[in-house]
Amino acid sequence: MRKALLAGLLAISMMAHSSEHTFSNVQLDNMRYAYQFGEQFSKDGKYKTHKNIHKSGLGHIMAAILWQESSGGVNLKSKPKHHAYGMFQNYLPTMRARVKELGYNMTDAEIKRMLNKRSNSASWAYIELSYWLNIHKGDIRKAISSYNSGWNVKAGSKYASEVLEKANYLKNNKLLEIVND
């Protein structure tokens, strides 16, 4: 009985400990960048105006997507047949379409090279997320789901839950706010 009780306590303490995350300085720097980048946009995906400048924006969402996609910008190795590049793991077929919509003629190599810069990867991630926010009339859960799985919202449901959970973790633990002394 005593062994079972100790094993149970150990399991509970391990579960509690596993919910805490330790980030490297590089991960924190990248997620703070994503947070600051996202904060210039309101939660409907539009640029903030003087009326809503002090309301929270897409900062935690952008940082959480970065965490989900590349572990905060440190896991950038491409996987076979994955076709996603940059810190936000921008999907190459989608990038081809978005670049073409803007009237640019870029090769895959040029797109991949462009996405190696975090500001470009963040910008294109925002463009994709704001597209889906517009399609889903501001429903952040559906937009995140579609960010991952396109029109098949149900297929991206688990992804959206994971991103929102990460965003809440980052927000609740105040890991991204810049402290002024």
Swiss-Prot record:
This is Uncharacterized 20.7 kDa protein in vs-regB intergenic region. InterPro entries: Lysozyme-like_dom_sf, Transglycosylase_SLT_dom_1. Gene3D superfamilies: 1.10.530.10. It holds the Pfam family SLT. SUPFAM superfamilies: Lysozyme-like (SSF53955).
